[in-house]
Amino acid sequence: MLRFLTAGESHGPALVAVVEGLPAGLPITIEDVAAELARRRLGFGRGPRMRIEQDEVEFLGGIRHGRTLGSPVAIAIRNTEWPKWSEEMSPAPGKTEKPLTRPRPGHADLVGMQKYGFDDARDVLERASARETAARVAAAALAKALLAHLDAHVLSHVVQLGPVRAAADHRPKPTDLGIVDASSVRCFDPDAEAAMIAAIDRKSVV
C-alpha cells in the first residue's frame, strides 16, 4: 500500500513529501520529479508565485544511484522566497511583530484560527496554501513512475469549462500529452480551448 505525507509551509525553507510503500529497484531521477513540477506551473491565469518558484528538488532519502531502496522516499522542494521570510517564519521561539488578524474570506484562515486557537492567521494560511500542492505533485510523480514501470500511463485533459465543452471526438491518447500540456487550459480541442480562455477572461472582467 502506498502512503504519502507532506510537511512545510508556503514561505518556510522547503516543502517535504514522504512516500512509503514503493518497491525497491524502481528507476527514478530528480529530473522525473522536476518535470512534473514544471507541468504544475503551466496554465492560463497562473499567479505570480508560479513565476517566482523554480521548484528545486532534492532527494533526502530512499533513493540511491537512481533507484528506490524500498524504504520511504523523502523529497524536499526549496522555497525561493525563504530568505525574505526567514525571520517571520523562523521555528525558533519568539513572537511575530506583524500578526495577521483579518482572515481572508473564502479561505481556511478563520476556521483554522478557531480550530487551533491561533491569534495569527499566518499559522493557518502558510499551510493552507496552493504552494503545498507542489509537495503533492512530487509524491504523485513517484506513483506515476511506478505506474509507468508497470506499463500503465496517465493522461488528463479538460473536457468542459463552464458552458464550453470540447467536441466528443477530441479525445487524446497518452502519446498526446505534449499537445495537451501546450494548451494553456489543457484542452485537446483547439476551438474549445479558445472559447474557454474567452470565458475565463469574461469572468475576470466582471
What are these regions (language model features)?
Residues 1-204:
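Generic N-terminal targeting/processing segments that precede catalytic cores or assembly contacts
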